[in-house]
Amino acid sequence: MNPVIKKFQFGQSTVTLETGRIARQASGAVLVTVDDDVSVLVTVVGAKQADPGKGFFPLSVHYQEKTYAAGKIPGGFFKREGRPSEKETLTSRLIDRPIRPLFPEGFMNEVQVVCTVVSTSKKTDPDIAAMIGTSAALAISGIPFDGPIGAARVAFHESTGYLLNPTYEQQAASSLDMVVAGTSDAVLMVESEAKELTEDQMLGAVLFAHDEFQVVINAVKELAAEAAKPTWTWAPAPEATELLAAIRSEFGEAISQAYTITIKADRYARLGELRDQVVAKLSGEEGQPSAADVKAAFGEIEYRTVRENIVNGKPRIDGRDTRTVRPLNIEVGVLPKTHGSALFTRGETQALVVATLGTARDAQLLDTLEGEKKDPFMLHYNFPPFSVGECGRMGGAGRREIGHGRLARRSVSAMLPAADVFPYTIRVVSEITESNGSSSMASVCGASLALMDAGVPMKAPVAGIAMGLVKEGEKFAVLTDILGDEDHLGDMDFKVAGTAKGVTALQMDIKIKGITEEIMEIALGQALEARLNILGQMNQIIGQSRTELSANAPTMIAMKIDTDKIRDVIGKGGATIRAICEETKASIDIEDDGSIKIFGETKEAAEAARQRVLGITAEAEIGKIYVGKVERIVDFGAFVNILPGKDGLVHISMLSDARVEKVTDILKEGQEVEVLVLDVDNRGRIKLSIKDVAAAKASGV
């Protein structure tokens, strides 16, 4: 086919969609170019046949940033790109979330999306271009997909309002970083962090983005009209109405009763018994459905039972109404040797969160397309299998753990002190020890508590809450503090974190169409009510940061020296600073402007290092008495060391009021003596006196 190109204006940028020139053997391939800044190649391949052994939709999204795109060669021994970075993993999730619900229910063919950043000027983030390209590639692929989608990034400034698709520079000055994706009539995904914006401002940003990305959807439709392949012939399997009716008739009441058991493990055990009974009764005989089909039908009855109960106003699975937060149990300082710790329990969800303070050298080094930079704040989330009572794989963090950790990080980062106020590197680790819904928001609450327990001067405490939705026709119910089952069986996962003043993070994933502005308003309102409730209970335990750091935390001393003294502190080949660090057991970081940060495992170590630096950088003061060591004796006097690297001359005439024939009659090398600084000339030479010390002391020097 001949290349097809579509151009359109999107905010302050011109976007070009091109297909038919590159990657023509893929089901769909689109090269997206934004101005001359970013080019992303997006390919989509769909398997023509489903794998009968997979009981789920095998969609995979891979976003990758090639270093050649920015004119760089990878570091390391092999000089090629390795495992996905955290940024690549997070962007892959960002693309996956809005497209997954648009594939038809029951579609089980494998689909793989690969987004490759092939060129960038390092001015803007390529993620929006990748999302637009994914929408376009799916639209022309012929794969069953109820799109296209649009996507946009929104920034906000009090004076100028909302800004579409900001550059990195514009984003740095913004109080909001929000990515929104959706179809022409519905929002499907929101990912954001903010600096205490109001609920109305956050909702306004979502609606602003939805209006603005309609131009993307229209452009993709125009591209598909010219370049799309024929849509696959695919139809869902017919609904097993007889099987569903049989299960509901004989086991419906028992299933409904099982969902009144409030303890998760007991509920799952009872449902497991019922599932086994249903499979034993309705499968296995000739002419009966397979066990897999019966289990699927049983799951459908579970789905309908829970949803019908909720929209009809019945109590939720654990007996709560739609607005109640589960009981909280909050502890701080639970681990005696850590710098700060908290145990946050909400119902059957529990997070053990630990804060650790380190030096500037402990900051995470990030090698990105934009260049190397250091991140002084890390938040890591771990979800071991025992937290849900299962055996499972133990190892490195998966995509879900990276995503949840980043959400928790977004939630608290705006409330951390500035680096010039608190120059420590901070690492927070959230260990999920129990899970039944919203462990990421438990991590937010636990992180805020642990940081305050560690003495990090937080601007305000932060709490988070997960909201859910069940919508059947015109009926709907917004749920506060959802359980794991309500997340799985519901239509929305809506997480809000913030302070008493405003929102610091908002994440939303919608599984259905038709989420209205009214529903989002209600969800934000209920989330605010719940957040204030949780903050109130947190404040009863610890309402503000401790005034002193933990005794286990390193001591930091900040000081500043003249820039021309930096080389004296460092010494030849770093010998001086290395000796100070080795002898005092402290670490020293020196900036080009003369700023020095000294970190010691103890206060004594840090102070010892500070005194050494002061000694090197101090200047001899005229009229001040020093205790010095005689370094060298000459015929006309003696050279006395009064400060590190600074010797002064005591002339023979300044040794004593009496006449001195030989200097060695008064002094010997290595002797400690008191000397008075008489003068420092313009070449830095120091003139000393011994005979004037007594008079200077008498005058009060």
UniProtKB/Swiss-Prot annotation:
Cell wall biogenesis/degradation as UniProt keyword: no
GO MF terms, alphabetically ordered: 3'-5'-RNA exonuclease activity; magnesium ion binding; polyribonucleotide nucleotidyltransferase activity; RNA binding
PANTHER family assigned: POLYRIBONUCLEOTIDE NUCLEOTIDYLTRANSFERASE (PTHR11252), POLYRIBONUCLEOTIDE NUCLEOTIDYLTRANSFERASE 1, MITOCHONDRIAL (PTHR11252:SF0)
Native source species: Pseudomonas fluorescens (strain Pf0-1)
UniProt-recorded name of the protein: Polyribonucleotide nucleotidyltransferase
Family: Belongs to the polyribonucleotide nucleotidyltransferase family.
Localization annotation: Cytoplasm
Lineage of origin: Bacteria, Pseudomonadati, Pseudomonadota, Gammaproteobacteria, Pseudomonadales
Domain S1 motif: 623-691
Catalytic activity: RNA(n+1) + phosphate = RNA(n) + a ribonucleoside 5'-diphosphate
HAMAP family noted in UniProt: PNPase
